[in-house]
Amino acid sequence: MVRVAVVSGRRAVLATVAGACMVLTGCSSMQQPDVEQAATTFEESGADPATRCELLAPATLVEFEEKESASCAEAIEDVPLEGGEVESVEIWGGDAQVRLSGDTLFLTETHAGWRITAASCQSRGEAPYDCEVEGP
């Protein structure tokens, strides 16, 4: 009987873990439209600089303005934002990566919604991405 209890206990634990994974995966898929919306709005060619700056995470905004020695609204106009179609979205916890046909962006979930932590990023293989806009 002890063996049955242990086996049943393992099954219960496995079922709980499997259920938690399904719930967590479901949460990621539910967040995907919000992540995509933030990324594509930031990259839209017609987006005004103020809108782009509002979509930056607070620490990224501060870092970007300090690096550029200018207001975000002035400096963001010089950043090459290639945009394009969404190719993939990866969400892990409160962070995300959106790959567009012309750019890669990184986002974080804040109390105000999904915000950009890095944009205009180029892959460097095994090295970290090289980004024109990035936070600490």
Model-derived segments and their meaning:
Residues A12-L14, A39-T41, L55-E63, T108-E109, ...:
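Short, intrinsically disordered, charge-biased short linear motifs at domain edges
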Residues S28-Q31:
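Bacterial signal peptide processing site
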Residues V2-V17:
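Bacterial N-terminal signal peptides that target proteins for export
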Residues T104-G135:
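Short beta-strand edge/turn micro-motifs at domain boundaries
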Residues V23-G26:
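C-terminal motif of bacterial Sec signal peptides marking the signal peptidase cleavage site
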Residues E36-T40, E44, A50-E90:
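Short solvent-exposed beta->alpha transition segments
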Residues L81-L107:
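Exposed beta-strand-loop-beta-strand "reactive/processing" segments of non-cytosolic proteins
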